[in-house]
Regions:
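Oxyanion-binding/catalytic loops of NTP- or PPi-dependent enzymes
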Residues: 2-239
Length: 239
């Protein structure tokens, strides 16, 4: 209301595709208690499909691959004009970009040990510095084959380099988990007579090149478009 300088009584809220009736009703009730009189719930994969251009003029079935910071889910969405049916859902709600960060932290500490830096007793401040560097390196490696980080630790300064290949090799088991769940949803869709045409990438962690590359390898007959601002795909689709 501060942004629009007017009262806001209608709201669109996105919810995970795995939400049941009770969870949806609880969400709607919470919005009503907050003062909203018109509450529309939109499943997140539907919002993502709308953002990718599915706005009433297409009839096909797509997969929405959503790899966020803390969770992963894969959903099959059947699109018939303005009708969106999320009919198959799988996910790992303990898996997300934070796990890739954790593996990068391990890589950094190994490289620090090679420089005779004892990582067993790092202070909380140094641990935070290592995690900051890990997140920064992960982002840099989306566009580069290698990246460097300068760390300012209590035990001294350090400079390390990590290659994309090194990072992808280390995190392959994490990506494998998402691929297995994606295969399961694709098989469920096929069993229902549906043909998957595209895999839409959602969630900031889907920026990592290994995601699109691996999906393209595993599903050669399905188009995997370049991610379109995956961090905001759901919110922009809802808007």
């Amino acid at each position: 209301e501060d942004a629009t300088d007017s009262a806001v009584k209608a709201v669109v809220i996105t919810v995970p595709a795995y939400f049941g009736v009770e969870q949806k009703e609880a969400t709607k009730k919470a919005a009503q208690l907050a003062g909203f009189t018109e509450v529309t719930l939109l499943e997140e994969p539907t919002a993502a499909a709308v953002y990718y251009g599915y706005k009433g003029d297409k009839n096909e079935t797509v997969l929405v691959y959503d790899l966020g910071g803390g969770t992963f889910d894969i959903v099959a969405v059947d699109i018939d004009g303005f009708k969106y049916d999320c009919f198959a859902v799988e996910g790992d709600y303990q898996l997300g970009g934070k796990d890739w960060d954790t593996e990068m932290v391990k890589i950094i500490k190994e490289k620090l040990e090679e420089q005779d830096c004892d990582c067993c007793g790092l202070s909380p401040e140094d641990e935070a510095e290592v995690r900051r560097a890990a997140e920064d390196l992960k982002i840099k490696l989306t566009a580069r084959e290698s990246a460097q980080a300068n760390l300012r630790l209590e035990v001294g300064k350090a400079k390390i380099e990590v290659t994309r290949q090194e990072f992808e090799d280390r995190t392959r088991p994490l990506l494998d988990k998402t691929i297995e769940l994606t295969k399961k949803v694709a098989e469920d869709a096929s069993a229902k007579g549906k043909t998957i045409t595209k895999i839409l990438l959602v969630g900031g962690s889907s920026y990592m090149p290994q995601v699109q590359q691996r999906l393209t390898e595993e599903f050669p007959n399905i188009e995997v478009p370049n991610p379109m601002d995956p961090n905001k795909a759901v919110s922009k689709g809802a808007a």
